Amino acid sequence: MSAAIDAVELSRELIRKPSVTPADEGAMDVVERTLAGLGFACRRMRFGEIENLYARYGTARPNLCFAGHTDVVPVGDAAAWSKDAFAADVVDGVLIGRGAVDMKSAIAAFAAAAAEAIAAGRVTGSVSFLITGDEEGVATHGTKKVVEALLAEGEAIDHCVVGEPTSAESFGDMVKVGRRGSINAEILVEGIQGHVAYPHRAANPVPVLVRLLAALQDRALDEGYPEFQPSNLEVTMIDVPNTATNVIPGTAKARLNIRFNPNHTGQALADWIAAEARKAADGFKGKVTVTPQISGEAFLTERGPFTELVAAAVKDVTGAEPELSTSGGTSDARFIRALCPVVEVGLVGRTMHQVDERAPVDEIRRLQAVYAAIIARYFA
């Protein structure tokens, strides 16, 4: 019989490892030791400087996977915290620490739920964990690489639960069944620097950049898509490195981000930005360079038995139906969708990445109960 796991104490042990991306600081060792103690076959997968772990209990199908990350964002102003960000103090029933919400407590909760299911003999197929140390960073050597390796090896994962903090206002009020895609673009306009009194001897990059950004901003990308918000474009930076009042600058730069629904693909949007750049630069003596970076495509896990199972498990614990949503930012679910249908369910995300990130202890235990209900229903 497997040993019981205290989800709160395991959360605290993980938080005490200051695993700010890309550092691991022993966090993955804690997860591996815990799962190995339950009888999981654990496999460390290191890509670059990033530690990853794939662990599986059982060899039969179906294989229900939990995906999460041990890395966390920086603390910020440590003096602004009421407690040490990595001390994992519990104050008035609330666990305070970086990773309490996003998302070390979810890893601990699913490990505790898995231990419970294994002890009760409920796992008639397999339960697995896909844990990375590269979700909060550039995410190139984490889940993406692990998924590519598992696909190449023919590892079968049938469904996946991601432990991101999906609850919006109250515990269990929201489950994520998809995500919008994301593309960043850097635009560099290179002109010819010169004196403002002699514009014919220069090529001002600023009007070109302004025309381009206006054209991009003025277009309504769409009016939404079933289950999705309308796509939106946001200019995130404009830089003209010129402090003189009598000089036409030589360069102008901007960055933008588009969060898009399935009406678009990242490549189609990159092509559109490039086409608009060519129009804005018509007759310009300089050069316009657009550098796009597609972070992920929009995806949706269609409503069906798996989404219904997860929603029912949440209702088992909260008594209320959760909203099935595609709102918010990107997550590693965008990579896992290549393996299997994926749903995200976790704690309330209100304090993630903030000073005094915190999670009520009772909500960590309720999350364990939700995960236990998912496992029980899955193998029923």
Curated annotation (Swiss-Prot):
Protein name per UniProt: Succinyl-diaminopimelate desuccinylase
Record-listed Zn(2+) 2 binding positions: 102, 136, 353
Binding positions for Zn(2+) 1 per the UniProt entry: 69, 102, 164
Family, similarity comment: Belongs to the peptidase M20A family. DapE subfamily.
Lineage: superkingdom: Bacteria
Cofactor note as given: Binds 2 Zn(2+) or Co(2+) ions per subunit.
Subunit structure, interactors included: Homodimer.
SUPFAM superfamilies: Bacterial exopeptidase dimerisation domain, Zn-dependent exopeptidases
Entry keyword set: Amino-acid biosynthesis, Cobalt, Diaminopimelate biosynthesis, Hydrolase, Lysine biosynthesis, Metal-binding, Zinc
Cofactor(s) listed in the protein's UniProt record: Zn(2+); Co(2+)
GO terms for MF: acetylornithine deacetylase activity; cobalt ion binding; succinyl-diaminopimelate desuccinylase activity; zinc ion binding
HAMAP family named among the record's database cross-references: DapE
A Pfam family matched in the record: M20_dimer
Pathway: Amino-acid biosynthesis; L-lysine biosynthesis via DAP pathway; LL-2,6-diaminopimelate from (S)-tetrahydrodipicolinate (succinylase route): step 3/3
Role noted for this protein: Catalyzes the hydrolysis of N-succinyl-L,L-diaminopimelic acid (SDAP), forming succinate and LL-2,6-diaminopimelate (DAP), an intermediate involved in the bacterial biosynthesis of lysine and meso-diaminopimelic acid, an essential component of bacterial cell walls.
GO BP terms: diaminopimelate biosynthetic process; L-arginine biosynthetic process; lysine biosynthetic process via diaminopimelate
Reaction catalyzed: N-succinyl-(2S,6S)-2,6-diaminopimelate + H2O = (2S,6S)-2,6-diaminopimelate + succinate
Listed EC numbers: 3.5.1.18
Active site (record annotation): 71, 135 (proton acceptor)
